[in-house]
Amino acid sequence: MVIPALKRRLEALREVSGGKVIVGVSGKDSLAVLDLLHRAGFELHPYHLYIVPGLEFRERWLRWLERRYDVEVLRWPHPDLSYLVRHGVYRHPLPEFPVLEFNDVFDGLRRELGAEWIATGEKMIDSLQRRGMMKRHAPEYLERDRRVAWPIADWNDRQVKAYLRQRRIPLPPEYAALGRGWGGSPFEKEAIRWLRDKHPGDFRRYRLFFPAVEAVLYHEV
């Protein structure tokens, strides 16, 4: 990543956003974006998308971020939660429950936080589909119609991890155990076992929302 190119990209984002940006904080890529924008002097409005609200292992992490960056992180339901509730995944279904898409969530965040532009940690290397979509918006990586920015679109995972190490930003706690963020697969056996064994209070809370979640541990692939 060439530093002058990154600076030009951030200046382009500042120009369209007025320096006021919504940014997620849940995974390693979004953390790099949060820190880059903070260092560049943007007014940040961070959010965290949850499947189950109020998990203490996650709340401790969010409180640490709030202290480090002097911000308040908005807790907001992940769009996947609407699908899980409607279709009864490890719980009773609610067939009339409305299913939301990410664009619905983004619109809700804009209304709640009072900013228009959203910066995400998505990268071209993540998938071929994402690469094709993002390359159309190079070199600024601003999707103006949707008001979405990808500041690290041309980074790779090695660069992201190196940046976080340099900035002494620890990964969320589940990375040490699972090697990835929690949000990628909230019902994967490995993740649920980790929650049950290491964070039993949070596991009990998970069961309040998804009473049959323990079945994950006994499912044979």
Predicted regions and their residues:
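Nucleotide-activated chemistry modules centered on ATP-dependent adenylation/adenylyltransferase
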Residues: M1-V221
